[in-house]
C-alpha cells in the first residue's frame, strides 16, 4: 500500500516536471495520487537478547555458509546499535576461518572496536573472552598486526 502510494507520487512528480525540471500546471494529479498515511509498526513479538544471540550464532555456524553470506551477515550485524556478544563474534570468526578469509577476521575485530566507541573497557573485554578462539584459529588482533598505528 505504501509502495504503491509512493510510486504514484513519484510518477505524478515526474509528469508535472517540465523539460528544465520546473513544475508546471499542465497536468495535476487526481485524487488517486494523494499520499495515504500509513503506520509502519511491527505487530510481531520482540526478540529477546538470547534469541538474537542464538539467531546470529546459528547463522554463522551454518556449515555451507559462503563468502557472500558471511560478509552480508557481518555488514548487517555491524549496522545494529550494539556491540555483538563474544559468542556471536566467535561464531563469525570461525566462519571466516572455515572460508580462509583472514581479512574478514580483522574487519570484524576492527568493527567491534569501533562499535565500542568511547567505552574503552568493552573492546579489551571482548578480546579477553575471544583470546582462546583467536589462539586456536591463529588469528591476530589489529593491534598485534600494528594496524592501530596506521
Swiss-Prot record:
Residues 1-41 form a transit peptide. GO terms for cellular component: mitochondrial inner membrane; respiratory chain complex IV. The modification Phosphothreonine is found at residue 141. Keywords: Acetylation, Heme, Iron, Membrane, Metal-binding, Mitochondrion, Mitochondrion inner membrane, Phosphoprotein, Transit peptide, Ubl conjugation. It holds the Pfam family COX5A. The keyword Phosphoprotein applies. GO terms for biological process: mitochondrial electron transport, cytochrome c to oxygen. In response to mitochondrial stress, the precursor protein is ubiquitinated by the SIFI complex in the cytoplasm before mitochondrial import, leading to its degradation. Within the SIFI complex, UBR4 initiates ubiquitin chain that are further elongated or branched by KCMF1. Its main location: mitochondrion. InterPro entries: Cyt_c_oxidase_su5A/6 (IPR003204), Cyt_c_oxidase_su5A/6_sf (IPR036545). This is Cytochrome c oxidase subunit 5A, mitochondrial. The gene is COX5A.
Amino acid at each position: 500500500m505504501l509502495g504503491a502510494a509512493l510510486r504514484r507520487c513519484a510518477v505524478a512528480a515526474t509528469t508535472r516536471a517540465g523539460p528544465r525540471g520546473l513544475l508546471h500546471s499542465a497536468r495535476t494529479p487526481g485524487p488517486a495520487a494523494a499520499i495515504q498515511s500509513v503506520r509502519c509498526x511491527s505487530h510481531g513479538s520482540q526478540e529477546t537478547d538470547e534469541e538474537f544471540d542464538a539467531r546470529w550464532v546459528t547463522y554463522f555456524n551454518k556449515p555451507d555458509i559462503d563468502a557472500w553470506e558471511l560478509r552480508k551477515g557481518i555488514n548487517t550485524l555491524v549496522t545494529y546499535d550494539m556491540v555483538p556478544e563474544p559468542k556471536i563474534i566467535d561464531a563469525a570468526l570461525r566462519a571466516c576461518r572455515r572460508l580462509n578469509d583472514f581479512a574478514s577476521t580483522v574487519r570484524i575485530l576492527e568493527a567491534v572496536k569501533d562499535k565500542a566507541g568511547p567505552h574503552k573497557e568493552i573492546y579489551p573485554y571482548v578480546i579477553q573472552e575471544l583470546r582462546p578462539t583467536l589462539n586456536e584459529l591463529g588469528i591476530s588482533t589489529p593491534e598485534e598486526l600494528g594496524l592501530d598505528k596506521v
